[in-house]
Amino acid sequence: VALWLLAVGALVASGWSHLRPSVAARTRATDIADLKAPDMGGEAFPAGLALPMLAPYRAAWGERLEFDAYRGSLPMVVDVWASWCPPCVREAPLLEAAWLRLSNRVQFVGVNYRDQRADALAFLDEYALTFPSGEDAAGSTTDELRIFGLPTTLFIDASDRIVGQKIGELDEATLDRLTGRAIGGSRGKDAAP
């Protein structure tokens, strides 16, 4: 009996990890595009969110990325990204081009998710991103926004309502359609970006 209790105790102490199938074995491989996000359509964008601004943007945009500074003025496109995320890499030039084309009508904002600062800065430099990006080193802002996959892009109208969300890599048609929805905002229809 003592030997049996000792064996059970050892299994519990080790966390049963070697007896349980891995997460990959318990779940089928799923493409990020197949995941269903919480429906945030029509919800208000949370107030009070702020992040430390990444260094290249501090001179022009300040020390902190204060989302409230944009509330009630321009629609926003909030892109959550990481340097180690292949779809984030692929969509970066598309987002920059849209920002350059629409910066007088839409505020683009980047949120770097739990990256090493040097890696995030190298990413910004390599893809020459000029819209402001803040760093979410602890993941608290992405938790508040209920982000669970990268990249995730939120589209917020000028009334601070989330009118669109894309989990996974953006294509130009989706970016234009959801940005148009943010611009159209309170009129309840998509506008041409």
Q: What do the predicted segments below correspond to?
A:
Residues V77-D79, G110, F155:
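Hydrophobic beta-strand core positions in alpha/beta domains
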Residues V80-L100:
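Conserved redox-active cysteine motifs that mediate thiol-disulfide chemistry
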Residues V1-Y57, A192-P193:
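N-terminal targeting signals for export/organelle localization
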Residues R90, L100-A138, L150:
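Conserved segment of the thioredoxin-like fold in thiol-based oxidoreductases
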Residues S73-M76, W81-W84, G149:
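Short pre-active-site segment immediately N-terminal to redox-active cysteine/selenocysteine motifs
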Residues A59-W61, I156-D157:
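Short, acidic, Ser/Thr-enriched surface-loop or helix-capping motifs
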Residues G72, A122-T130, E135-P193:
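Thiol/disulfide oxidoreductase modules built on the thioredoxin-like
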Residues L65-D68, V163:
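Generic structural signal for well-ordered beta-strand positions
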